[in-house]
Amino acid sequence: RLCWFCACHTQGTRTLSPVESYIETLEAELSLMRATIPSGLRMGRLHWGGGTPTILPPHLIHRLSRAIRAVFPAHDLFEFSVEIDPTMVDRAKIDALAAEGMTRASIGIQDFDPVVQAAIGREQPFAVTKACVDDLRAAGITSLNTDLVYGLPHQTLARIEDTIAKVLSFAPDRVALFGYAHVPWMSKRQKLIDESALPDDMARYTMATAAATLFADAGLTPIGIDHFARPGDTLDTALRTGQLRRNFQGYTADTCQTLIGLGASSISRFPAGYAQNAPATAAYIQRIEAGEFAGSRGYTLSDEDILRARAIELLMCNFRLDLAELQAEFGPRAAALTPVLEGIA
């Protein structure tokens, strides 16, 4: 299924055949990686997302995990997070993911109200989600992340408060609270959403602030602009120790500057810049089958880009900028931001 509110690159399928073929292409891309990367690299984090990895049956879960580990052996402090669709997972899939080392499950909830769910093309009953959470806990998955969205069609303060009460009953370790971005010119499926049912700016603000209060009252620590974490979670620890980071997926405790993306439309981050694979699945497969990487565009960061990116990250993580801190990291180059700091002081 394709949820109407999502602006990410996804593709629906009703049979397993294209999924199996896609796994073969991922294996081919990994083989190209093996022949290119330096020896001795170890993987600290692994994330399966970009739709729902739980479309994979257990045998393909094992197959993909082993293919990745054959190229990128796991670090001692390895973390493995997986996006879970409660309507497309069962205990056998959860057990397979747990056997492959999954440490964190991430469940996209958005809103539990059936009126809101119908308006965004995503049916996900609370009872089904609770059963999924129970299975995850029973399988030994100790870290649970939930994603909520405010600003959805027909969403009201009462409805989002009811959703949050249900989410808190799961005792999540992390919560991400994102604002819905209505961009139908970028994501054609969003044209299925009734624009007249979208909350106005003041209603969005009221929902966001009320949600933040409810999470804080439940004992979760506010993390940056849109995340919350239980005390003792690695995000909470990273915030307190100055190690919190922000990437294009959200907040993270991972300070590594290298992120390697696999698959169609995936984005890789390196100390020197970014690279993205071909967004179209057919184009991605064609490039990999030709024995070449599928990169379609990239961006090389200048020294000033890196400095400004770090300054923005510090603001998003800590809500403050310290020139001395930037000088300790960048040396004399940090002085280039002095006019900016003076302007916002």
Question: Which positions does each model-derived feature cover?
Answer:
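C-terminal extensions of enzymes
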Residues: Q327, I344-A345
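Short amphipathic alpha-helical interaction segments
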Residues: P332-G343
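Local cysteine-cluster metal-coordination motifs and their immediate loop/turn environment
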Residues: R1-T10
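C-terminal scaffold of the Radical SAM
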Residues: T10-T36, L41-P332
